[in-house]
Amino acid sequence: MKTKIIIYICIWATAWAIPVPQLVPLERDIVEKSADVPFLAHPGTAAQNELHINNATNDDSPKGSELGRQVHSNGGYERDRNGSESIAVGGKSSPTQPILANAQGNSAKEREDVETYGHDGIHAGGENSTANGIRGQVGIAENAEEAKESKVHGQPHQDTKTGLASDTSQNGDATLVQENEPQVAGSKNSTNHEVGTHGSGVAAQETTPQREGEGSENQGAEVTPSIGEGAGLDNTEGSPSGNGIEEDEDTGSGDGVGADAGDGRESHDGTEGHEGQSSGGNNDNRGQGSVSTEDDDSKEQEGSPNGRGGDNTSSSEETGIEEGDGTQTTQDNQNLSPTEGGIISQAEACPSGQSQNQGLETEGSSTGNKSSITKESGKLSGSKDSNGHHGMELDKRNSPKQGESDKPQGAAEKSDTHNNMGHSRIGSSSNSDGHDSYDFDDESMQGDDPNSSDESNGSDGSDDANSESAIENGNHGDASYTSDESSDNGSDSDSHAGEDDSSDDTSDTDDSDSNGDDDSESKDKDESDNSNHDNDSDSESKSDSSDSDSDSSDSSDSSDSSDSSETSDSSDSSDTSDSSDSSDSSDSSNSSDTSDSSDSSDGDSSDGDSSDSDSSDSDSSNSSDSDSSDSSDSSSSDSSDSDSDSKDSTSDSSDDNSKSGNGNSDSDSDSDSDSEGSDSNHSTSDD
């Protein structure tokens, strides 16, 4: 027995001992091989990028310091070149730097390359480059503040004109590297990249926004650092595309981008610029929240027909939002103006993207006070253009349908892209269901289209937005909306389609408009109250979120009816920021709201959205009463201005109530119920 036991033990010991040496070396070999493979592949690839990036970034971090010094001292081209060196953070410092310094066209191309390489390098060496780039960005942000405090406003405009695109792309890559961590950093430069990542409008948006303003890239640069500095973006966009001074930029782009850029430029202007900064900067921050969200749909919108047109605008803008928000805002803050500097401050202050959304909306709203209505029109579709711009941010998220919506208002590609999008999508954006709301909005818009005769006035989403706009606008001051929006927004013809009816009815008979346009629409709303009122409550969901946003945005709309409308869009875009954007929009833009209650159509629009949904619902029931009060407010643009202020505040309250579901009594509650129903329907539609 002992012998057997000993033999057994020996056998067991040998059996146990033999595999161990075999398995251990095999595992070691496997581990070593596998370790070697990742280290070779990952560091090999990343190491190159990281080498370039880290070298460029380490160089650029000092260069960022030098940037600050040189930018502060030199103000202009050294910023560009240091910006190029910052782009060198992207990894292609020398080619990028000379080319960017050499030409904007090259800087656009280079920007693409820099985006490509820099973005890859950034992703590859993103951590190091992000850390270093963040250092550089800190230096840049500080330098941007210095620059913005320094002659940044003056010289950077020159730089903006001359080297803004390059400077922006440079800053974009630098900032990308800097803020590559958030992927919004990727969105910065990589909004083109990220757009490229999305792949819908990759080359188109990279190339087109770059071509458009070369501010896409610049905007891409902007996007991440500020995270949604639509002003900076628009500045970038307006600057490169406009290649003009702030004001020229304002008209320089000529596009919605130009308007946005112009508004951003106005933000550069430092007058509206700072105001646009405050609302614009805040809006930009809000816009940036939109940016991230939008960027997802930004690719879609980029994929959209207007993804090219509107996306060049929108994409540039949204790239500007996504892309252009941060970096160029950073160095546009350095380069462009204290406004964008303020935007950076606001962007830094509001990195959440809340204020940036407003800024984008604000800038987008510079596309038109349309935009300011947009938020409401987002609900109202009336400010489709400005909504378009803001909707762009929003539409970026939901751009495919936006593309559909874009088509009707193709003239205002951004706004058009955003109009329908802005309308349904703002609601959807507001409904942080963005896509869900949007799809539901499109569907409900389309559903409203059949349901509501007004919605058949124009295109599907546009008319839906329009009829909803008209409805809401008809009630909430289609006259004022139409007066503001109709006057401002020729391309609100869709909105005017319902809105002129509504506007005529509203201006002639606001109650009739509410009863007629809005009543029929509202009765369609009431009949299709779930569909239209789902739209309405989609709008009211938008009014719920969007009205909150719209409220903030309406407040924002009222604040910068154009800016705020885009802010409302950005508010809508910032669904997460939505409440915050309601706070920011409502607070910042509400102050502006009361200020720019002159955009009472916005206030009215928000009222019109909430109250006019209210009036629409109430309008069917109490069409002349609610609609009288609403339409009175709405029809009295001035009264609705005052009312817009109070009602904007009320609209804020009622939109907050709308968020609460209390709404403007009937329709807001209904809309809120419908809004939740429509939110459910949003989800359902999207589902």
From Swiss-Prot:
Protein name as catalogued: Dentin sialophosphoprotein
UniProt keyword ATP-binding present: no
UniProt superkingdom: Eukaryota
Post-translational modification: DSP is glycosylated.
Record GO cellular component, one term: cytoplasm
Signal peptide positions (record): 1-17
UniProt feature, compositional bias: Polar residues: 93-107, 161-194, 276-292, 352-375, 418-432
Annotated Basic and acidic residues bias: 146-160, 262-275, 386-417, 522-545
Residues bearing attached sugar chains per UniProt: 55, 82, 128, 189, 312, 369
GO molecular function: collagen binding
Induction cue: Down-regulated by the CEBPB-NFE2L1 heterodimer during odontoblast differentiation.
Residue ranges of the region described as Disordered: 54-113, 146-687
Subunit structure, interactors included: Interacts with FBLN7.
Keyword Signal annotated: yes
Tissue: Specifically expressed in teeth, mainly in odontoblasts and transiently in pre-ameloblasts.
Keywords: Biomineralization, Calcium, Extracellular matrix, Glycoprotein, Phosphoprotein, Secreted, Sialic acid, Signal
Predominant cellular place of this UniProt entry's protein: secreted
